[in-house]
Curated annotation (Swiss-Prot):
It is found in: Cytoplasm. Belongs to the 'phage' integrase family. XerD-like subfamily. It comes from Streptococcus thermophilus (strain ATCC BAA-250 / LMG 18311). Residues 8-81 form the Core-binding (CB) domain. Keywords: Cytoplasm, DNA integration, DNA recombination, DNA-binding. GO terms for cellular component: cytoplasm. It comes from the Bacteria. This is Tyrosine recombinase XerD-like. It holds the Pfam family Phage_integrase. The lineage of its organism: Bacteria, Bacillati, Bacillota, Bacilli, Lactobacillales. Its main location: cytoplasm. GO terms for molecular function: DNA binding; tyrosine-based site-specific recombinase activity. PROSITE patterns: CB, TYR_RECOMBINASE. Putative tyrosine recombinase. Not involved in the cutting and rejoining of the recombining DNA molecules on dif(SL) site. The keyword Transferase does not apply.
Length: 253
């Protein structure tokens, strides 16, 4: 059996395996994602050698992610054995190794961003830090996209829309600047991205954080969501991404 046909056969088994599980669609997506990664690592067979190769690749991930992937793979291996697809029962070690000493991305103290003077720079910073929005998305936001009573923001990106939870300091700031005449764009009129980047740069500089960029703020949003326990698929949805592939580096050790 060729590697491609072997992987195709196991991919079919993944579908059958997940069909037996009474779990949410998002959990099934996570299982499918982890198991397809596992199958793609196999050199045309399941044995101790191929499992060792896979376990070596797992070392790149954080212990919490390793634990999730190990659990999913072990359940799948047991399923294959019980179905008679494997003549021998294989199992990955349940214990993840200690995290490496590699430099990790850090969550910064950005409390000063909440204390600065109100204006477009502060508003943009909080939209990025609390909701992970892109500057281009902020520029297109309209008051009609925001429901302060229900605490939600609807963000349109192409033909898709996502609804994000709005609370904390950003919600308070929007309450403070909204009035009976508030309509149209949040920033009152159309501006360029270059203009908004300058507003952000000026504001963070005034808060003593001159090295912090819009990209860094979005990265901080990602790290804070991961710290809360947000999974890769849910985080991708919050950010408006089509897949969690670009987020994998944040879930690695």
């Amino acid at each position: 059996m060729t590697i491609s046909s072997f992987q195709k056969q196991l991919t079919t088994q993944i579908t059958n395996f997940l069909a037996r599980k009474t779990i949410s669609d998002s959990s099934k997506q996570a299982y499918a994602y982890d198991l397809k990664q596992f199958v793609n690592c196999l050199p045309g067979r399941v044995d101790q050698t191929s499992l060792k190769l896979y376990e070596n690749q797992l070392k790149e991930w954080k212990p919490s992610v390793q634990k999730r992937k190990r659990s999913a793979v072990n359940q799948f291996l047991l399923y294959l054995y019980q179905k008679g697809e494997l003549e021998e029962f294989f199992k990955l070690s349940e214990t993840a190794p200690l995290p490496s000493q590699q430099e990790e991305l850090e969550i910064f103290d950005l409390s000063s961003l909440y204390e600065g003077q109100e204006g477009p720079g502060k508003l943009a910073c909080l939209f990025i830090l609390e909701l992970g929005l892109l500057p281009s998305e902020i520029l297109e936001l309209k008051w009609e996209d925001i429901d302060l009573d229900f605490g939600v923001v609807t963000v349109a990106k192409g033909s898709t829309k996502r609804v994000l939870r709005l609370d904390g300091a950003l919600k308070e700031l929007l309450f403070g600047i909204k009035n009976d005449n508030s309509q149209g764009l949040i920033l009152s009129k159309a501006f360029t991205r270059q203009w908004l980047y300058k507003q952000i740069q000026s504001y963070v500089g005034g808060c003593g954080l001159s090295g912090v960029t819009a990209q860094a703020l979005r990265q901080q949003y990602i790290l804070r969501q991961i710290e809360k326990g947000t999974g890769a698929f849910e985080l991708a949805r919050l950010l408006g991404l089509k897949s969690p592939v670009t987020l994998e580096k944040y879930y690695k050790t």
